[in-house]
Amino acid sequence: MDFNASLRKAIKTGDVLLGQNSTAECIKDGKAQMIVVAANCPSTYRTMLDEQNDVYVHTYEGSSMQLGKACGKPFMVSALAIVNAGESDIISLKRA
């Protein structure tokens, strides 16, 4: 599976929230199916995510700038929440 292609497809066909604040709110509301964080995501935020046992957290191998680019955005994205993957197979990472 090409992670970047699956991520773009989820953004295009599903419901994906970008940013730490939106991601934290999505977790709090219990709507997130999966969280993706950049490798350079702040450690305090990552610690908070690791305490959430009910949602899978995937660490993207690139920086927040690279994650933003993978999302098709011209800005940094350190965290995102996948609420609905749409036609993407990205949620299959939870089973891997």
From Swiss-Prot:
GO terms for cellular component: cytosolic large ribosomal subunit. PANTHER family: RIBOSOMAL PROTEIN L30. It holds the Pfam family Ribosomal_L7Ae. The lineage of its organism: Archaea, Methanobacteriati, Methanobacteriota, Stenosarchaea group, Methanomicrobia. One of its GO terms (biological process) is translation. GO terms for molecular function: RNA binding; structural constituent of ribosome. The keyword Ribosomal protein applies. Keywords: Ribonucleoprotein, Ribosomal protein. Belongs to the eukaryotic ribosomal protein eL30 family. InterPro entries: Ribosomal_eL30, Ribosomal_eL30-like, Ribosomal_eL30-like_sf, Ribosomal_eL8/eL30/eS12/Gad45. It comes from the Archaea. SUPFAM superfamilies: L30e-like. This is Large ribosomal subunit protein eL30. It comes from Methanosphaerula palustris (strain ATCC BAA-1556 / DSM 19958 / E1-9c).
